[in-house]
Amino acid sequence: MLELAILGFLRDRPLHGYDLRRRIAALMGHVRPVADGTLYPAIKRMEASGRLIRKDEPGIAAAPRRTLYLTPEGRAELERRLRDPDDLDISDENRWFVLLAFLRHLDEPGDQAAVLRRRLTFLEEPTSFFYDDGDRPMGAEEFGDPFRQGLLTIAHATSQAELAWLRATIEALERGETGAGAGTGADAGAGAGAGAGAGPGPGPGEDAGAGE
């Protein structure tokens, strides 16, 4: 998840290490704090593998600042991860948010739609945070306390909103509408706050009580 975020933000634009950390923290810091001891070793590994390079550039003060750039190898790796994500990238909500933040960097609407369809298929499976003795998913109406009712009601509403968005976006992409494409890097930081504001989310039980 961290390497995908690094690749994605550097695909948006070259960044200094501090700026990269700030963007990653906004996108996924609510899941796991982005510490220097995690980020910079990852950057070094990716530099050693040829996926990014560092260039010294003049800073505001006397000391030069190192700017990170994605290489062609890094761009190819990003596109591979976006086009063929792991199953966990589809099913885990937090990993999905990171993937979704950079899906615009796939050039083909058909490739974008294929990834969204995998998420749609996952969400359409009946699931819940709670099951009865027969392993049947339980809905909010089956609980007498307001807390489990609230958990399942919120999860259901979140899931229904995502399902509606997925279906509409897949339909638009399959019609060849390319407005969801990569665009420019001008709004590179725009999506970061969205992930943070969404919070951890309901996780694997997000379609709880759908009753579909």
Q: What are the functions of these language-model segments?
A:
Residues R104-D107, G134-E141, L173, E177:
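Secondary-structure edge/capping motif, primarily at the C-terminal ends of alpha-helices
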Residues Y131-L151, G181:
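Acidic interhelical loop/turn segments
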Residues A113, L120, T127, G134, ...:
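Heptad-repeat amphipathic alpha-helical coiled-coil interaction surface used
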Residues P109, L116, D145-R148, L152, ...:
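Amphipathic alpha-helical coiled-coil segments and their boundaries
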Residues L152-G176, D207-E212:
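Long, low-complexity, charge-rich intrinsically disordered regions
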Residues E79-S128:
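Amphipathic alpha-helical dimerization/coiled-coil segments
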Residues M1-D92:
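Basic helix-turn-helix/winged-helix DNA-binding cores
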Residues G179-G211:
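Small-residue-biased low-complexity repeat regions
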